[in-house]
């Protein structure tokens, strides 16, 4: 069950990253989130 949750989160994260990557300032946003 835990593995399924991780897979779901990975899919969601991938979608978010793709959306951010198409917008200006995406790199800045990612850096801020990682800190």
Swiss-Prot record:
GO terms for cellular component: extracellular region. It comes from the Eukaryota. The keyword Secreted applies. It is found in: Secreted. The modification Glutamine amide is found at residue 35. Expressed by the venom gland. The keyword Secreted applies. Keywords: Amidation, Secreted, Toxin. GO terms for molecular function: toxin activity. Its main location: secreted. Belongs to the cationic peptide 04 (cupiennin) family. 02 subfamily. This is Cupiennin-2c. It comes from Cupiennius salei.
